[in-house]
Amino acid sequence: MIQIPSDLNPGLVPLAFLLGTWEGAGVFDFPGEEKCNFGQEVVFSHDGRDFLEYTSHTWVLDSEGKKVRPLESESGYWRIDKDRKVEVVMVRDQGVVEVWYGELADQKPQIDLSLIHI
């Protein structure tokens, strides 16, 4: 069950399912880059204003799943309007700024986003 904090801005209730700390692991495999295992931690938080704060950190993992070194980090803000349109503005540690727009699906926790600006 999703818990909605009492101090969450009412306009952000549709995004409440994102709040908290999320962790996972995968394989980093991009052309021109060294393939490696990685771990990721994503945190969505709020302070009562009309946006969610987002941070993400990834690390290279060894064969036992232990952190070897930082891989990438990014941070930004998520907003939603009354028509369920979502805007994400984030900056990556390489100095790249991304703006994503999309829509929150009806009746399920799914957001479809498209990159608009880099």
Report each predicted region and the residues it spans.
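Flexible, membrane-facing loop/turn or short amphipathic-helix motifs
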Residues: 28-34, 62-66
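Helix-adjacent hinge/juxtasegments
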Residues: 63-102
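N-terminal glycine/threonine-rich, aromatic-flanked beta-hairpin/loop signature
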Residues: 39-61
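Conserved small/polar residues in nucleotide/adenosyl-binding loops
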Residues: 116-118
